[in-house]
Every structure is written in structure tokens, then in C-alpha cells.
UniProtKB/Swiss-Prot annotation:
The protein's name in its UniProt record: L-ascorbate oxidase
Cysteine disulfide partners in this protein: 49-231, 111-568, 210-223
Catalytic activity annotation: 4 L-ascorbate + O2 = 4 monodehydro-L-ascorbate radical + 2 H2O
GO molecular function annotations of the record: copper ion binding; L-ascorbate oxidase activity
Keyword Zinc tagged: no
Binding site for Cu cation 3: 136, 480, 536
């Protein structure tokens, strides 16, 4: 009897401690479970001092910041309170190893969450870094559905650089026209382009019809703000003689941006959640989908405040710079700097943009890429007309997502859910990237590039002339489910001669990369994350117009997928027939 009682005691203790783990959200390895309950809904807001409708979370715009340590589990209970729209949220830069269904891409990883429904996102944040989240259905990111996601090192570990304080900055662009009107315009004959944004927002705040720097330009209307308005500048409060880390992420729908602080050099230390070899610069270019950490030292005249300026690059500017203050405490925020804000470099100075981008290399000790790849895919970016509609296409295929999510369709072998013929992996060698496209074979499609697990893949992104003469645009491309090595950039068409210029020594790891006008960008990644993953231009209207592809790898190895992720299209029928 006594022996039996002793045998049961450890089991009771195990259950007791397991209960504590659940109650306090602490895993057995010291990581935590961080639970959030979010309600997504439209609400009236005035991001740039003009009232409009934004998509917010729990009454906040931008949405709440998620903060966790590497190794933590994040659980987001998402309730869709939109009246007539579905919703999903993509966790930008989070690899979703083991949870591809939680990537938050409608028609790829999951079904859209219907109005009134609740969906639980449950995933592990593996790596420290500066990330963010955003809507990934239609153009909901442009409507304001985004927020910050910051991952600190695991408990007991430190960053490889010192700083005394931290400032988190989320950059976005804002239109007064609704996303629904924008979507209809983009899908019309003839196309109605969305135009340039009205305002650049810093942490969801900007000024459309006034300027906080009006004293330097008599043509500008001064702002008369008390500081409590939703459009009042988000002030960077700092103490003199300290080092601050500024985490910067761009959720813009269209704009490429330039960030600068008057009189303060920026030390770049992180890009897309990966450490880089530190380097100083006066300003940084940041494209949609990218994130950076920069360090600044507050060693300037402590009796002054300094301008923080965010201007547009890469497109002919029709949007004033977003402004705020670096406020040296205890100075009053009403004390404006003695000089004008930093001037944004010329919008079309692409050499300057390239020089900044080329300086980004991996920090010492970072993982190196495999020496050779098993497979190489060339992706030609072109603008085309299909049945009178203006579309973007990759290798003459404009992506239109199917009603059944790829992940479920491939998991349950639903062969009719999407085109079983893979898209082209090359484009014609004689294609002239310097002239407008004339190929009449461009089509709408939804085929998939499939990889074997462990396959080492090179992707060559090739830019080209648009339909208008002498015009080629910057495109930032984002890959879900992976980081990749950026092996190189170049002007013109990629050829075999470019092979020797590829960087295999210290290429940076990124999840978003830019291709410059009339140029190419080469990346390499390992297909080691079972799932189905989007790879697309992060400019919202370009993706809406078909500028993306879909990668799949090892779907047969994917574990159980939550039923709610598949409750639409052909997978819904499978669930009904096979409960």
C-alpha cells in the first residue's frame, strides 16, 4: 500500500506543475505562451487630421504591438467583426516552422475568416528581430490592418550591440480613397490607378493639410495641434549622451521611403530580423516589407531638438515627407529645430539607392549559403494587358488565387483545385527588357512551383520595361516561410557572365529584397520548411494585379491542419464528406 502511494506521488506532482505551466503561460523550457484576443473592425479615425475609416484592432490604429522572446509561443484569438468581409493576418518575417497554416495568407495557407467567426493563430517565434503583421486579403493592409511584432533574444541572452533605450517606428502610406474603390479601379477597363498616397504616416500619424515645419516655408499651413489628436506627431523622446535603437518597419502599400534624422548618423545593425555588418549612413532607403534596426547616439547640442524626416523615393513624389521630432529631454516639444528638416534625396537617384543596398552584408558568424544550388528559376517581371485589363505577370502568368487554399488542396490531393501544370521556370533568352512588352500569350494562372525538401533553390528576379516607354519600377519581393541569401544585384539582363560576381562570402539573410529598374537580383534559399508559401511583390496594388508566385515543398510532411483553416472551397467539401 505504501509503495503504491509513493508511486502515485510523482504523477500528482507532474500534473500539479503542468497545471502551473498552463496557468502562468510558461513552457517547460523557460519560454512563454503569450495570448492575445483581438477584434478586427472598421472605425472612424483621423490618421492625417482628416477623418476617414480605418481597419483597427481592439479600437487601436495601428494595431497592438506583440512583444515576445525567441522561443515563445504566440496565440492570437482573432475575431472578425467586419460586417461583410473576410480577414486574415500574416506574421511578416515569422517562418512558421511546423505551423504553415498560421502564415495568414488567404487562399494559400488558409481560408479567410468570415464575419462573426473566430480563428486561433498559434505559432512559435524562432528568431529575435524586428517584424510586423498585416492583413493579407485584398488590400486590407492599405486600410490600416497592421502592427509591430518585436522578438527579443531568449531569456538570459543579449543582443550583440549595446543600447540604452529603444524606439519602435512603423512606417505606412495613407490614401483618402477607400481600398474598395481602389480595388475596383485596378480591376476596371480602362484601369484607374490609385495615384500617390496623400500622407506618410509615422506610427499611424501624419498631417495632410498642415505642416509642423511650416515656419521654414511660407507656402505651408502651420499645424495647430494640442498633442492629443490622433494625427499629432509621435515624438521620439530621448536623453542626451545615450545610445538608442530605432526599430523601423515599412508596411507601405506603394511608397519606397527614405529615413533620416537631422545631425544624427545612423548605424545599421539589423535587416529583416538578421544581424548585418554594422555601417554608418546619413539616411536609409526602406522598401515595403523591409525592416531595419539603427543605432543613434544623442551626442548633439542638448539644448536643441532635431527633425526626423521620412520622404518618398523611387516614384515621382507627390506626397510631402512625414515629420516628427527627436526631442532631447528636458526640452519642450514645442521647441522646433533651428534648421529645416533633412532633404530627401532625389526620387530618381537610383545610384544612391543601390549604394546603400549594396553595403548591406551579413554580420560575422552568420550562416553562409550553400556553395551550389540544385535548381535555378528565372522570374521575369512584366506589365501586360489581358483581355483589356492591365495586369502584372511573372513569366507571362498573372497570378489569380483559387477558392480552395493550396495548403489544403495539396495536403488532401485535390487535383482540380488549381492548375497542375507548373508555371514556366525561364523566359525567352531573346526577350528585350528595354522595350515595352508585346507578348500576347500572357494569361491568368494559379500553378505552383514545387520543390523537394532540402532542395537548394536560386531565384533570379529580372526587371524590365513597363508598357510605357522608358519606364521600369522598383519592386520589393517578399518570401513567406523562409529567409534567403541575397547573392547579388546587377543592371540589365542576368547572363552567365554575372555568375562570378555573386557573393557567397557574406551575403545578407533577408525575407524581402528589391529589384531596381531594368536590373536583376539573385537570391538563394533552402526549401526546408514543409508548406505552401507566397513569393510576391510587396506593393499592394501590384499583388492585386497578379504580381506573385506560389512555392510548395514537402506538403506531405505537414501535420494536422485546423479545420477552420480549410472550411472553404474544395477542402470544405472534403471535411463534410470525411468528418
Amino acid at each position: 500500500m505504501l509503495q503504491m502511494g509513493k508511486a502515485r506521488e510523482p504523477n500528482f506532482l507532474i500534473l500539479f506543475f503542468f497545471g502551473l505551466i498552463l496557468a502562468f503561460g510558461i513552457s517547460s523550457e523557460g519560454s512563454q505562451i503569450r495570448h492575445y484576443k483581438w477584434e478586427v473592425e472598421y472605425m472612424f479615425w483621423a490618421p492625417d487630421c482628416n477623418e476617414n475609416i480605418v481597419m483597427g484592432i481592439n479600437g487601436q490604429f495601428p494595431g497592438p504591438t506583440i512583444r515576445a522572446n525567441a522561443g515563445d509561443t504566440v496565440v492570437v484569438e482573432l475575431i472578425n467583426k467586419l460586417h461583410t468581409e473576410g480577414v486574415v493576418i500574416h506574421w511578416h518575417g515569422i517562418l512558421q516552422r511546423g505551423t504553415p497554416w498560421a502564415d495568414g495568407t488567404a487562399s494559400i495557407s488558409q481560408c479567410a475568416i468570415n464575419p462573426g467567426e473566430t480563428f486561433f493563430y498559434n505559432f512559435t517565434v524562432d528568431n529575435p528581430g524586428t517584424f510586423f503583421y498585416h492583413g493579407h486579403l485584398g488590400m486590407q493592409r492599405s486600410a490600416g490592418l497592421y502592427g509591430s511584432l518585436i522578438v527579443d533574444p531568449p531569456q538570459g541572452k543579449k543582443e550583440p550591440f549595446h543600447y540604452d533605450g529603444e524606439i519602435n517606428l512603423l512606417l505606412s502610406d495613407w490614401w483618402h480613397q477607400s481600398i474598395h474603390k481602389q480595388e475596383v479601379g485596378l480591376s476596371s477597363k480602362p484601369i484607374r490607378w490609385i495615384g500617390e498616397p496623400q500622407t506618410i504616416l509615422l506610427n499611424g500619424r501624419g498631417q495632410f493639410d498642415c505642416s509642423i515645419a511650416a515656419k521654414y516655408d511660407s507656402n505651408l499651413e502651420p499645424c495647430k495641434l494640442k498633442g492629443s489628436e490622433p494625427c499629432a506627431p509621435y515624438i521620439f523622446h530621448v536623453m542626451p549622451k545615450k545610445t538608442y535603437r530605432i526599430r523601423i518597419a515599412s508596411t507601405t502599400a506603394l511608397a519606397a521611403l527614405n529615413f533620416a534624422i537631422g545631425n544624427h548618423p545612423l548605424l545599421v545593425v539589423e535587416a529583416d530580423g538578421n544581424y548585418v555588418q554594422p555601417f554608418y549612413t546619413s539616411d536609409i532607403d526602406i522598401y515595403s516589407g523591409e525592416s531595419y534596426s539603427v543605432l543613434i547616439t544623442t551626442d548633439q547640442n542638448p539644448s536643441e531638438n532635431y527633425w526626423v524626416s521620412v520622404g518618398t523615393r523611387g516614384r515621382h513624389p507627390n506626397t510631402p515627407p512625414g515629420l516628427t521630432l527627436l526631442n532631447y529631454l528636458p526640452n519642450s516639444v514645442s521647441k522646433l529645430p533651428t534648421s529645416p528638416p533633412p532633404e530627401t534625396p532625389a526620387w530618381d537617384d537610383f545610384d544612391r539607392s543601390k549604394n546603400f543596398t549594396y553595403r548591406i552584408t551579413a554580420a560575422m558568424g552568420s550562416p553562409k549559403p550553400p556553395v551550389k544550388s540544385n535548381r535555378r528559376i528565372f522570374l521575369l517581371n512584366t506589365q501586360n494587358v489581358i483581355n483589356g485589363y492591365v495586369k502584372w505577370a511573372i513569366n507571362d502568368v498573372s497570378l489569380a488565387l483559387p477558392p480552395t487554399p493550396y495548403l489544403g488542396a495539396m495536403k488532401f490531393n485535390l487535383l482540380h483545385a488549381f492548375d497542375q501544370n507548373p508555371p514556366p521556370e525561364v523566359f525567352p533568352e531573346d526577350y528585350d527588357i528595354d522595350t515595352p512588352p508585346t507578348n500576347e500569350k500572357t494569361k491568368i494562372g494559379n500553378g505552383v512551383y514545387q520543390f523537394k525538401i532540402g532542395e537548394i533553390v536560386d531565384v533570379i528576379l529580372q526587371n524590365a520595361n513597363m508598357m510605357k516607354e522608358n519606364l521600369s519600377e522598383i519592386h520589393p519581393w517578399h518570401l513567406h516561410g523562409h529567409d534567403f541569401w541575397v547573392l547579388g544585384y546587377g543592371d540589365g539582363k542576368f547572363t552567365a557572365e554575372e555568375e562570378s560576381s555573386l557573393n557567397l562570402k557574406n551575403p545578407p539573410l533577408r525575407n524581402t529584397v528589391v529589384i531596381f529598374p531594368y536590373g536583376w537580383t539573385a537570391i538563394r534559399f533552402v526549401a526546408d520548411n514543409p508548406g505552401v508559401w507566397a513569393f510576391h511583390c510587396h506593393i499592394e496594388p501590384h499583388l492585386h494585379m497578379g504580381m506573385g508566385v506560389v512555392f510548395a515543398e514537402g506538403v506531405e510532411k505537414v501535420g494536422r491542419i485546423p479545420t477552420k483553416a480549410l472550411a472553404c472551397g474544395g477542402t470544405a467539401k472534403s471535411l463534410i464528406n470525411n468528418p
